[in-house]
Structure formats: C-alpha cells, structure tokens
Design a protein with these regions (language model features):
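Amphipathic alpha-helical segments of tetratricopeptide repeats
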Residues: 19-20, 59-67, 101-112, 150-157, ...
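Residue signature of alpha-solenoid helical repeat architecture, marking inter-repeat boundaries
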Residues: 29, 71-75, 116-120, 160-163, ...
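Residue-level recognition of tetratricopeptide repeat
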Residues: 40, 79-82, 86, 124, ...
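Residue-level detector of the short coil/turn that links helix A to helix B
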Residues: 6, 46, 91-92, 137, ...
C-alpha cells in the first residue's frame, strides 16, 4: 500500500524531471506552472526553504513576463503570491503585505473555474490572507479579501457556507474595530452573531468558528463599553462568558485567560451598575479559576468564625 509520503516523493521526482526539462527547453508558462506545483509538493513535505526558492523563481518569471507585456495565468499568479505571503508571515510581515497586495487587483478575475482554485479554496484563500493581515496590524488591506470572499460564498445556505459567512463578518468586524471604524464594526459583528447564534443553538457551529463567535461578543462589548452603553456591553460579555462556560462544561478546548478576563470585567461593570449580587457571582467564578476550591475555603472560614 502506497503511503502519502511515497506518493509525494514520486510526485517530487516527476516535477524535478519536468522542471529540468523545461529549463533546458520549454515555454516560460509551462516552467512557471511546474515551479508552482513543485513548490506545493515541497511545502507539503516540510521542505520550506526549497519551496520558497521555487516560488521566488516563479516570481522572477512573472516579472519577466510582465516586462514583456505577457499575462501569466491569473490562478497561477495568485497561487504564487498567496503561498509566498503565507510563508513570510512569521518572519517578514512587510513582505507578506507586499505579496497579498499584489493579489488584490486580481481578485475580481477569480472564479470557481480558475486554475489551482475552486469555490471552497477561494473562500479559504480569502479568509487566511485576511486573518494574517489583521493579525499583522494591516487591517485595512484585509477588507478586499473579505468583501470578495463573501461574493465567493454566494447565496448558498449549507452549514459550511453559513459558518464561513459568519466567520468573514466577524473578521471584518475585527478589522473595522482595529481601524477605529466602530459603527461599521458593530454592524459586522451583528451580522456575524445573527448567523452564528442560530448555528450554535442548533449545534451546527463548527470548531473553526467557535473562537470567532466568542470574540465577536467580546469586541462588540468593548465597543459598547467604550460608547458608554454599559447595559449592552454587559449583555455581550455575559454571552461570551456563557459560551466559554459551556465549552468548559463539555470538556472542550477554550481560552481560559479570556474566560477569566470576562468574569473580572463583568464583576467590575455590574458592581458599577449597582448589581452587587451578579457582580459577586462573576467575581467568585474568577476567583475559582485563579484559586481552585476557593469557595470551600470561604465556607470553612465562615464556619470557623461561627465556632468562635
């Protein structure tokens, strides 16, 4: 039985032969395509330096073609700069930005029949580029990817599409939040939460979307708190805390630091609002996270005082 590793090694040998042959005698477009495919194989094998080298050679070919007035295949062009940008993310975010900005003018030319892509991979490309841009503080540059990603999703209503639509609106809200465009961010978070809440209540929200679901409540609450709308911010923070509590109860992965911060924040806001009982409830939850069995210790302390 052939393993995936054996399959990749055979594919690599095939493309080594193809690249060597095309470098000796072959069309520029064919060599470009072979380099992109070999780079993908090398990336899957974990040979990242060699993969980047192939992508840089491909970028050189693209530049030469553009100088000569030739147009490389749009799917191949996007794949080169997408993969190179992702590989630069950890080491050189400015280069990543340059790569992704090269893609933006090509977004309108992409569709489900584009070379190297189908509908789902176009959505994935849009989301992943946008995520890395937002994480690297290039929020504004993420918006063209998200706007196009929503178009790639179309009007379908299957669970995968609805999850990705909610994820895109959440990320768009985060981008607008980081840009200081708070009114737009609130609209984005509302769109995301309308979809995600329905999916969550019917157990159709997927794992990839859970983090975005919680952070949509948190960032929306941050904006409302900033705007002085304490009642709405408390409601959204409580929704985030409820989801995190549910994940903990189910034994699933959750952001413990975020959960602790939510309970602390809610305790403060509720105390400021004069709701002492609810404030103490969240304070106790925060204390239990920091000091396990703190409730038992408090009860024992009270019992000790009564004995005296």
């Amino acid at each position: 039985m052939r393993t995936s590793e054996t399959h990749l090694e055979e594919a690599l040998q095939e493309y080594n032969d193809k690249v060597n042959a095309l470098e000796a005698e072959g069309s520029t477009e064919e060599l470009l395509e072979a380099l992109v495919n070999r780079s993908t194989i090398l990336m899957l094998m974990g040979s990242y330096v060699s993969s980047i080298t192939d992508l840089e050679d491909a970028m050189d070919i693209i530049r030469e073609m553009e100088i000569e007035g030739k147009k490389p295949n749009v799917g191949t062009f996007v794949k080169v700069y997408e993969n190179h940008g992702h590989m630069c993310y950890e080491e050189d975010v400015d280069m990543m930005l340059d790569d992704f900005q090269r893609i933006i003018p090509k977004l309108s030319l992409l569709n489900a029949t584009t070379r190297h892509y189908d509908r789902k991979s176009l959505v994935h490309m849009s989301l992943e580029c946008a995520k890395e841009l937002v994480d690297a503080d290039f929020a504004e540059s993420s918006l063209p990817f998200l706007e196009k990603g929503l178009l790639f999703l179309g009007s379908m209503t299957d669970d995968w599409t609805m999850n990705r639509r909610a994820e895109m609106y959440s990320l768009m809200g985060e981008a607008h939040h980081d840009m200081g465009v708070y009114d737009e961010a609130l609209k984005d978070f509302d769109r995301s939460l309308d979809i995600a809440s329905e999916l969550y209540l019917s157990n159709r929200l997927d794992e990839d979307m859970l983090v975005s679901f919680v952070y949509s409540f948190v960032l929306k609450g941050d904006i409302e708190d900033r705007n002085g709308d304490k009642e709405k911010s408390i409601a959204d923070y409580e929704s985030a805390a409820d989801v995190l509590d549910q994940l903990e109860n189910e034994g699933r992965n959750f952001d413990r630091e975020l959960m602790l911060d939510m309970h602390r924040t809610l305790s403060r806001l509720l105390m400021e609002a004069g709701d002492v009982e609810r404030a103490e409830l969240h304070l106790m939850k925060a204390m239990k996270m920091e000091v396990p069995n703190v409730d038992i210790a408090i009860k024992n302390l009270g019992a000790g005082k009564k004995d005296h």
